[in-house]
UniProtKB/Swiss-Prot annotation:
It is a peripheral membrane protein. This is AP-2 complex subunit sigma. It is found in: Cell membrane; Membrane, Coated pit. The gene is aps2. PANTHER family: ADAPTOR COMPLEXES SMALL SUBUNIT FAMILY. Component of the adaptor complexes which link clathrin to receptors in coated vesicles. Clathrin-associated protein complexes are believed to interact with the cytoplasmic tails of membrane proteins, leading to their selection and concentration.
């Protein structure tokens, strides 16, 4: 189970968070961001699944929270539900850390968001599944500032 990348984009397609676990050129990254947004933005939350076939034997697992799309590109043979739950776990940690997280928190506290992401995912793998452990580590990091 390995991630290729994680993207958080708003409804307009602005990328608020991007973490790349596979080597892509800058041109490829821009192209992938656009392709992912075009795939997930028009989908109906009520009647369509949160999994979309992508290219090169990969798929996009995504979840929409308010105006943000949290997207993960995973191998086609990986368990989609595990990554869907990992995305939800990441958002729960963000919610608890920031107190009802919003898009502005991602923009102005991006370094903290990347720290949280690095606590949950390491080298494209799900690393930590305990919310309390992640929040305790983040408290320790906050004390260092």
């Amino acid at each position: 189970m390995v991630l290729s990348f994680i993207l958080v984009q708003n409804r307009q397609g602005k990328t608020r968070l991007a973490k790349w676990y596979a080597p892509y050129s800058d041109e490829e990254k821009v192209k992938l961001k656009g392709e992912v947004h075009r795939l997930v933005a028009p989908r109906d939350q009520k009647y369509q699944s949160n999994f979309v076939e992508f290219k090169r034997s990969t798929k996009i697992v995504y979840r929409r929270y308010a105006g943000l799309f949290f997207c993960a590109c995973v191998d086609a043979t990986d368990n989609e539900l595990a990554y869907l739950e990992a995305i939800h776990f990441f958002v729960e940690v963000l919610d608890q850390f920031f107190g009802n997280v919003c898009e502005l928190d991602l923009v102005f506290n991006f370094y903290k968001v990347y720290a949280i992401l690095d606590e949950v995912f390491l080298a494209g793998e799900i690393e930590e599944t305990s919310k309390q452990v992640v929040l305790t580590r983040l408290e320790h990091l906050d004390k260092l500032e």
